[in-house]
Amino acid sequence: MNVLEQFKQLDNMPEQYKTMDRDELEARARAVKEQLGRRLFIPGHHYQKDEVIQFADATGDSLQLAQLAAKNNEAEYIVFCGVHFMAETADILTSEEQTVILPDLRAGCSMADMADVFQVERAWAALTDRFGETILPLVYVNSTAAIKAFVGRNGGATVTSSNAQKMVAWAFSQKERIFFLPDQHLGRNTAYALGVGLDEMAVWDPYEETLQGNGDFDKVKVILWKGHCSVHENFNVRQIEHIRQTKPETKVIVHPECSWDVVQQADYAGSTKYIIETIRNASPGSRWAIGTEMNLVNRLMHEHPDKEIISLNPYMCPCLTMNRIDLPHFVWALESLSEGTVVNRITVPKEVAFEAKLALERMLALA
């Protein structure tokens, strides 16, 4: 069986849901929500489709959703409208009596897949051999539970785009150097904002198993994993220059998963929560070019018709893995619960969850 066939087998939704029209699907979703009541909790990430996010009991960015999962001790079922690592995080932070479900198991994250724990352990061995015990690992929540466990085991913590500066500052209070993974751009942008020079950063290439950079490696303060977000890689300086030339009154706001060059050229940079709040608080008639996932950009356009909002990249498409959570899969997961069947349960092994929770709790204690 090839990889494509294995991937297709992850989707075992009955055919009947694929042929239902939207009105029927929405009616069925409402019926199950009413039936299960407080036994059901539906968190939704800002990048989710409107057809799904309308049923969310709470929406947020990665930090907000982690906090919600940690505080929720009432719901029996948590149907997570996000991607795999978010559902894993929810399972880690909730009790054994609670069940976490991901409507479509194909909803992964390409960035999280750019680092596996075996690569990370080899990198750590090489880096600690060179730098000794002067390094602390920090991992973006966009990562597997196994890597979070590795970080927790080695005294580190998780970070989100909302609290990255606070967490990097904390890490520097613990050790001289930081090993930041898997998103090199968030790590670089955050460290630079805190005064770390580009010549004080280096990149670890997991395939070459080498440290890469232009500075003196003995003076390196931040070691970045060579990973990135496939969505935010599609924003570039040329797009900003085009906005400056054709729409000079337009402000550019981007997510810190964008490259350093893009963040430096933008007017504002911050998490999804920051972007949402900035647009919400902006003056009527203001003009904005937003560099982040398209579902969120489209939602902001709809919610703020008094402002001129466009995507920084006119050819941008939504995050393909976030888009896996669609209305048919969502309703199938809900109706299965109403019939007493759990589909697509996300379960993190206890020994992994224990150490991963250490990394998450260190972050949440500072949040």
From Swiss-Prot:
Its cofactor is [4Fe-4S] cluster. One of its GO terms (biological process) is 'de novo' NAD biosynthetic process from L-aspartate. It is an enzyme of class 2 (transferase). GO terms for molecular function: 4 iron, 4 sulfur cluster binding; metal ion binding; quinolinate synthetase A activity. It is found in: Cytoplasm. Belongs to the quinolinate synthase family. Type 3 subfamily. Iminosuccinate binds at residues 45, 62, 140-142, 161, 255-257, 272. The gene is nadA. It comes from the Bacteria. Pathway: Cofactor biosynthesis; NAD(+) biosynthesis; quinolinate from iminoaspartate: step 1/1. Pfam families: NadA. Its EC number is 2.5.1.72. This is Quinolinate synthase. The keyword Magnesium does not apply. Gene3D superfamilies: NadA-like. Keywords: 4Fe-4S, Cytoplasm, Iron, Iron-sulfur, Metal-binding, Pyridine nucleotide biosynthesis, Transferase. [4Fe-4S] cluster binds at residues 109, 229, 319.
